[in-house]
Every structure is written in C-alpha cells, then in structure tokens.
Design a protein with these regions (language model features):
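H-loop (His-switch) and adjacent beta-strand-loop-beta switch element
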Residues: 212-224
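Short, Lys/Arg-enriched, disordered terminal segments
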Residues: 1-4, 224
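ABC family nucleotide-binding domain
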Residues: 5-6, 11-27, 31-208, 212
C-alpha cells in the first residue's frame, strides 16, 4: 500500500515588489514513499518556489504542508529546522557550501557527531561514487563548480533522510556526470525507499523519474 510522505494542500505564494508575482496558485500535490519525481517548467513557472515550500525553507501565504502526515505549516523556525535535520535532505542549486570547511567536513556537518565516527567508510564510499573522493581535503574555492555541486549532493544523501529535495542538481555538470547523478538518485530512491523530488529544466534528466510534474504559471498542468 502506498504511503504519503510529503503533501502540499492548496498552497499559494506571492512575491511582492514593484511587480507582484504569483509564484504558486492553490497548488496541491502528494508524494509517496520511494518515488522519484521530476518537476519541470520554464524559468519563473514556480517550480523552485514549490520545492522551497515543500522543504519548509519558504512559507506559503495560504495552504498547508504535511511531512509524514504531520502538519508543519505554522511551526516555529526552530521546530522547522529540527524537522529538516531529521527528515529532509536539500540539494541547493548554488551549492550552499561553507567556505571555511573542506568537502568532507561539509558533507558530515549535518550528521550527528557519533554517527560521523561510525560512518566514515560509508561517506567515503559515497564520495567515491560521486567521483569527489580526491576532493576530501579541499575547500570549496579549490574545487570546480561541478565538484561543489557533487559535494552538495553527497551532503544531502549522507543524512539518509526520508525525503531528498533537489533544485537543479545536474545544472552545473557535464552530460556524463549529469546522467550519473540522475542514475544515483534513482537508485537511492529504489534501494532506500527515499522520496526524491528533483526540479530540472533538462527533459533528458526528467526521463529518469517515475513521475513527471509540469508547473506552468504557478499551477500544475501535467502530473503523470
């Protein structure tokens, strides 16, 4: 039987400024355990806003977000941070690495101290699968954009969260590495029953997903 792990109910989000932008309009979507889903759409369609709302990094103006059946909308900043640490791995489009830490230190940072000691071999194997083991002791400024992106991906996967949310995870990679990342995410979804939601502008990467969701003008126009 399918199990809901992530849900948005009628969420809306408007960005106000000189020009008011309605990024999401009464959007509802359910993600089940072990799914690998791709969200596609043109730039400015609302796909990254939806991902940030699902990750509790952005607050919808209306509607509700549920994680593992728990209503998280309206919780305090500290409560949301706790939920993210336990249940969500997030892959940022702009890497979001700490410049004062090495690649390895960036990856283990979200992991509990005791688990870091026990899981060094596992983390090194993960880095090897992403072809960044040689970056273990390098700082972000010493790595290419593609290497930094793969460190960001390793950090999200290392915490073994139930949900992985990825904002353009292959955007800074060449075709071969992009395919490797998409395949790795797909396998992680299958082997560990992780729910993976990937925002991408690349139709070829979306083909790796079990389900494709298209966002157009802040609304879901395709969900299959």
């Amino acid at each position: 039987m399918s199990q809901k792990v992530l849900e948005a109910r009628n969420i809306s989000k408007t960005y106000k400024g000189e020009i008011e932008v309605k990024a999401l309009k009464k959007t509802s979507i359910i993600f089940e355990r072990g799914e690998f889903c791709a969200i596609i759409g043109k730039s400015g369609s609302g796909k990254s806003t939806l991902l940030r709302c699902l990750a509790t990094l952005d607050v919808p103006d209306e509607g509700e977000i549920y994680i593992d059946g728990e209503l998280v909308t309206g919780k305090s900043v500290s409560e949301l941070a706790r939920i993210r640490r336990r249940k969500i791995g997030y892959i940022y489009q702009d890497y979001n690495l700490f410049p004062e830490f090495t690649a390895y230190e960036n990856i283990v940072l979200p992991i509990h101290l005791d688990d870091r000691r026990e899981n060094r071999e596992k983390i090194e194997n993960l880095m090897e699968s992403l072809d960044i083991l040689n970056c273990c002791d390098k700082f972000p400024t010493q790595m290419s954009g593609g290497q930094q992106q793969r460190v960001s991906i390793a950090r999200a996967l290392a915490i073994e969260a139930d949900v992985i949310l990825a904002d353009e995870p292959t955007g800074n990679l060449d075709a071969k590495n992009a395919e490797n990342i998409a395949e790795l995410l797909r396998k992680s979804s299958e082997i560990y029953a992780q729910t993976i939601v990937m925002v991408t502008h690349d139709a070829q990467m979306a083909e790796y997903a079990d389900r494709i969701i298209r966002i157009k003008d802040g609304e879901i126009s395709y969900n299959l």
